[in-house]
Amino acid sequence: MVMGLPPGKGAGQVTEDPSRATWLQQARSYLRQADPVLAPLIDDRPDFDPRAWMAQLPPMDLYGALLFQVAGQQLSVAATRRTLARIEALFGGHLPSPAELLAADPGQLREAGLSWRKIGTLRDLAGRLSDGRLDPDVLSSLPDDELMAQLTAIPGIGPWTVQGALIIALGREDVVLPGDLALRKAVRAAYQLDHLPAEQEVLAIAEKWRPYRSLATSYLFSAAFERTADVPPSARP
């Protein structure tokens, strides 16, 4: 699970800047008018900082964010954090680079909590980054849809994984995670639906949030956090 960030801000970054305050004010005002359902979620949280949750994570580049997302597939946030801490311990207190992960003993990665399938996915991704088939600088400069197409070509990496990385590592401001079970439940509660919305229904609702879908999503996730001590697993890879 991820929370929306102002543009250009990734995990582990909490430095204040004037442009951020301006951006938040503009985005909140836009969302209040665009979707009355979001207005009380915004107004009831005047001190809500959409970067606060991210600040609990170590600084992540694109590979680190994808590692975090892959590790978190089908897991709660708490379980993902535990796995991440064990992985960091294997690499001297930091997330591994692609080269470091390729050099690691897969058995140790398994003991850290990664499934064999996830290890295979991460090694495949690390190999593509290490041998030049994928260039992280080029990837980071791509529009969301092109980056999605490049990364979802890798077995084990689906839209949910990439969507989270877009927010965590790149601070993309117009991202929504329609396959996330917690978000779908949050939408059901906020919109008082009598059913769990499917992905397409979430996307249809989220159209009115453009170009601030990441921030709108963060408010809904915040409401979900407040209703439960932990977050259920995502429904998507």
Regions of interest found by a model, annotated:
Residues 71, 143-189, 215:
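Catalytic DNA-binding helix-loop module of base-excision-repair DNA glycosylases/AP lyases
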Residues 90, 125-132, 150, 154, ...:
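Mid-sequence acidic-hydrophobic segments that form the walls
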Residues 96, 179-207, 236-237:
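C-terminal end-helix/capping segment
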Residues 1-142, 146, 204-237:
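N-terminal polyanion-binding entry modules of DNA glycosylases/AP lyases
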